[in-house]
Amino acid sequence: RARNPNAIRLFCIQKLCYTVLNRRNGRAFVPSAAKREFMEHRNWNKNNIRTSLLGYGCMRFPTKADGTIDEERAEALLNTAKAAGVNYFDTAYPYHNGQSEPFVGRVIAKWGRSSFYLATKMPLWNCKSLDDAKRIFEEQLQRLGVDYIDFYLLHSLHKARYEKAKAMGLVDWLWQQKAAGRIRNFGFSCHDNSAGFEYILRDQPWDFCQLQYNYLDRDDRAEEISGDRGYQLTEECGVPLIIMEPIKGGTLASLPADAAAPLHALRPDATDASWALRWVGSHRNVHVILSGMSAEDQLTDNLATFARFEPLTAAETAAVEQTAAFLHSRIKVGCTGCRYCMPCPMG
């Protein structure tokens, strides 16, 4: 009887996660046969950078009843991901009410520094002056326990916020930090329409940028989304792209039956989340797809998706477009739960 290769792959990933999540003081324990997973990687045309296509977003760790990070579970998740080949870890100054960076720093202190890429971001809303930004940058290095950041971003830019950062001298100062070796790659994350994004993108020789992109957020009807045009601009400008919210804050991980029907007709055993991730990963200029995995089953599923990654076929792309059309007819407010827009503009 022929075996389903996807089922075999998922079984292997589940076995890896089960083994690693039998925690030994929070450290990953991986049997030798499982040490090398076929994690999809993307090569950058500079500095021999090779990132895992799946990146770990450190904004949605499992939490305890009091809202603090469940550090034992979260560390096991991070170690499991790294053991399976994930090498890009993305945090930020405000994540988990300021606790993500210190926690991530404690975990990565147990890893070899050259074995992973670390990303964090400058919170411009906390910067009334360049001195504020300098203080925060030094604090981030201290929190993370490192002397350089692999990928450093201006956080959550729109055109007006970017102009403010330039006017205070922050953009120039961060380029100076790159020249000094304290930043290896300098970029930005953006929550603006395609016109605002294009203005920022073309204004500096950015090393990379980060956008919200998924099969629902393809136009820029919402003022904070740059959509397909934003993606096209990154190709035109030759700027490597990192994707946030590929599953739209979980919306695309649990679809209504009617919406999922075109997908399940082609791959009955594939999860809804895997379709969303494969749609994003099928774009050639996408170098990292961030996923904020807060539970073991989410990590297991995502590792299975990115083990020997398969781009969408033409028929699968058409099925995703059917699903997107159905969802657009039903969804009134496209909230991802990121809280960047608070207070909520929709009330």
Locations of regions flagged by a protein language model:
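Short alpha-helix boundary/capping segments
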Residues: 1-6, 241
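N-terminal binding-site loop/beta-alpha segment at the start of enzyme catalytic domains
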Residues: 17-18, 24-30, 34-116, 173, ...
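Conserved, mostly hydrophobic/aromatic
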Residues: 44, 56, 89, 104, ...
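Short, well-ordered coil/turn segments that N-cap beta-strands
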Residues: 49-54, 85-88, 112-116, 146-150, ...
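Active-site mouth loops of central-metabolism enzymes
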Residues: 60-72, 121-131, 260-267
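Short, acidic/polar
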Residues: 68-81, 129-144, 192-200, 272-277
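Beta/alpha (TIM)-barrel catalytic core signal, keyed to glycine-rich beta->alpha loops juxtaposed to Asp/Glu
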Residues: 97, 157-343, 347
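Active-site groove signature of glycoside hydrolases
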Residues: 144-160
